[in-house]
Amino acid sequence: MTEAIYETVITTQDATGQAHVAPMGVRYRPLADGSPGVVLMPFKPSVTHDNIVATGHAVLNIVSDTRVFATCVTGRRDAAVLQLLPLAPEGQVAGQRLACALRHLQLRLATRQDDAQRPLLHLAVLAQAEHAPFIGLNRAQAAVVEGAVLVSRLHLLPADKICREMDYLQIAIDKTAAAEELQAWGWLRAAVAAHLQSATPSAAQSATPSPSPAQRQPPAPNPQKDVA
């Protein structure tokens, strides 16, 4: 049976205490003893993987502010969006959580199955806390998450497919987005535009996403992508 994958944000820190934030799909899978667990399978090279192996700890953040996903995959690393808070004094792991998290889970590495491309990290859930209610599903938020996944794969996809996908996702943005989603979407559109402009002139001209009245274009993002 296929396990559901949930889009979350993982915060880790290295041995010196330097924090790292990365969107990551996770599976909720109990440990061998039946206690709650979380599975991560980051692609190498991965700062998240290296930090977890070095410290044995991670924090899983559940967010509804999709700007977190967009700012990470576009390389913007917006400090206001990625604001971190220390864990409560009784925290069981070394780390920080996102200030915008609706909920966070403190994780400790239980087992690791190494792999040349995607190692499997099985982490135990030590503690969790809720900070704000989940108020419901929103189509624009889902579209931003899908757009973020698309942007993370721009180097793998043909230009026409990128534009078709963005145009389809634009429908949900136009109909259901609020200010946060519009800002996140603008960052993603700017990243796509920059990618297409760097392609051959003919490809960029023939594969341009349709303009939208809801689109808010900020300056082009830093092309340097972050490593999960």
Which positions does each model-derived feature cover?
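Short, well-ordered beta-strand segments in soluble/periplasmic domains
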Residues: 38-42
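Active-site-proximal mixed secondary-structure blocks
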Residues: 1-19, 31, 47-202, 224-228
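A short, well-structured catalytic beta-strand-centered motif of the EAL phosphodiesterase domain
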Residues: 24-27
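Periplasm/extracytoplasmic soluble domains of Gram-negative envelope assemblies
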Residues: 34-35
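Intrinsically disordered, low-complexity repeat/linker tracts enriched for polar/charged residues
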Residues: 197, 201, 205, 209-217, ...
